[in-house]
Amino acid sequence: CYNGLLLGGGSYTLCRLILGNIAKRAKDKKDFFENQLPYVMERMALYMDERIRFEVEESGFFESNFLAKEGFIHRDRFTAMFGMVGMAECVNILMELEGKKGRFGHDKEADDLGVEIMEAISAFNNAHVNPYCEATGGHFLLHAQVGIAQDKNITPGTRIPIGEEPKELIDQLRHCSRFHKYFPSGTGDIFPVDVTVHKNPQFVLDIVKGAF
């Protein structure tokens, strides 16, 4: 994912919203969008701001680290990664709270809700300004985080949970296309492919070309 960052730069920090846990705090969809999600995003952004302030103003990293001293990295090309995981769990919980059966990756209303959540996160990030992220217009970069070893029942980023993928690969690719645009600093998906593909690598290349 660091390939999405500026050459000669990097990320001060990566923090993440665990969207499923935020949804568990909500009484309903309205409460999620008006209270729970904004509260957690604000707390995380302030936490990231303080981490960045310390790194730049107090730690001495950019004055003492050999990478900076030898010109390999430059502070003014750094930004930060505003991460998220658990979109699938979040959407499914909110759908249940609204008395609806649709699930993320299989239902248009559920997928539309996922896009609505991403629009809210994107709007918050675009409104939040950090003085030391000037390389990216003063804003963090959104990042669909793949998870950590301790995660339980948390689906990475905006992925459809493993085992719940659509039967047709094209349907999964279309689903991905609705979310990938939000994440300049990285996102990823897992696609089940039949083992016989080893005999026909051109098939995979065609899928990649079609996906792009």
Predicted regions and their residues:
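Hydrophobic, structured segments
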Residues: 89, 102-103
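Contiguous, well-ordered alpha-helical segments that form the cores/surfaces of helical PPI scaffolds
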Residues: 80-93
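Conserved catalytic cores of very large enzyme subunits
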Residues: 1-76, 97, 103-107, 111, ...
